[in-house]
Amino acid sequence: MSNAYEEYMRQMVIPMRQELVRSGFEELTTEEAVTEFIENTTGTTLVVVNSVCGCAAGLARPSAGQAVVRAEKQPDHLVTVFAGQDKDATAKMREYFGEIPPSSPSMALLKGKEVVHFIHRHEIEGATMDEIITNLEQAFEKNC
């Protein structure tokens, strides 16, 4: 059963979801969608663990969107899960991150099912947009 707070949050995060979707990211909103995607996808994937926090709005989402536009080499796939909103999907995605502690927002570059690059929240909070974009571009150059 949905309460007023949950409905408010669902409405509030719509623009936060759409920002990544407009940049070409596919939303994975269920545990099953995450499993199906990971188990049936080859190549490289940039995963953005989205969040409602200010560093997601001001740094993570715009940096991810700009990096995939600017980079010469790009991941084959772009997906996102939303921490705190799509809890089962986020928990399932984090299982594929292995021993990496939960962090939101965060970004993971996967090669197949293996995490080859990870950007934690603390690396996002203390960086500029250009630094995050460069971090991603270098990871794409090395792994894509």
Curated annotation (Swiss-Prot):
Q: Give the top-rank taxon of the lineage listed in the UniProt record for this protein.
A: Bacteria
Q: Which Pfam families match?
A: Disulph_isomer
* Alphabetical GO biological process terms: cell redox homeostasis
Query: Which Cys-Cys disulfides exist here?
Result: none
Family stated for the protein in its record:
Belongs to the bacilliredoxin family.
Matching PANTHER family: BACILLIREDOXIN BRXA, UPF0403 PROTEIN YQIW-RELATED
- What name goes with this protein? Bacilliredoxin BCE_2233
Task: Tell me which species this is from.
Answer: Bacillus cereus (strain ATCC 10987 / NRS 248)
